[in-house]
Amino acid sequence: MQITEITKSDFEAFWPIFKDIIQAQETYAFDPELDFASAYQLWCISPQKCFVIKEDDSILGTYYIKPNAPGPSAHISNCGYMVSPHSRGKGIARKLCLHSQQIAIELGYTAMQFNSVVSTNGIAVKLWQKLDYNIIGTIPKAYNHKRLGLVDSFIMHKQLE
């Protein structure tokens, strides 16, 4: 497996998975009707950097990194991760998160914050906690889950060393 900066052709290959994930409305607060061009801009162009993890020619997952906020708070990074369904349970999200922390340090960030981890996404919450992220806040009924209705979201944070 190797992690590299994303190309447009990588995103084109991952697009069906990306679209399925946002249309499921279980983990990401993206418009489920987002088109390719808007999704590419949102995930790959607007962030500071974007990466994919590949095995052979298969894309297993992706993440972006960007400042969580501008100006005096720009030392805190924010990331988003997606893993293809057929790659789940293989440690891909963990590898991506560890890679993103290293990249964050290289880019001069001192912390990482996830602004809206859907509380019902137990696998992600548990993984982030194993990787020393703390829940620093709960946003009540912040996410309109397709099957469960309004559920809480967590703000999760980690100081980087």
Protein language model annotation of sequence segments:
Residues 1-14:
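A short beta-loop-alpha structural element at the N-terminal edge
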Residues 129-139:
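Conserved acetyl-CoA-binding loop of GNAT-fold acetyltransferases
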Residues 81-82, 139, 145-161:
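Terminal substrate-recognition subdomain of acyl/acetyltransferases
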Residues 15-41:
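Conserved GNAT-fold acetyl-CoA-binding loop/helix
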Residues 31-86, 97-98, 103, 159-160:
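Acetyl-CoA-dependent GNAT
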Residues 58-61, 123, 150:
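Glycine-rich acetyl-CoA-binding "A-motif" of GNAT/NAT acetyltransferases
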Residues 104-117:
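Conserved GNAT acetyl-CoA-binding A-motif
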Residues 114-124, 143:
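Conserved beta-strand-loop-alpha-helix junction that forms the acyl-donor binding cleft
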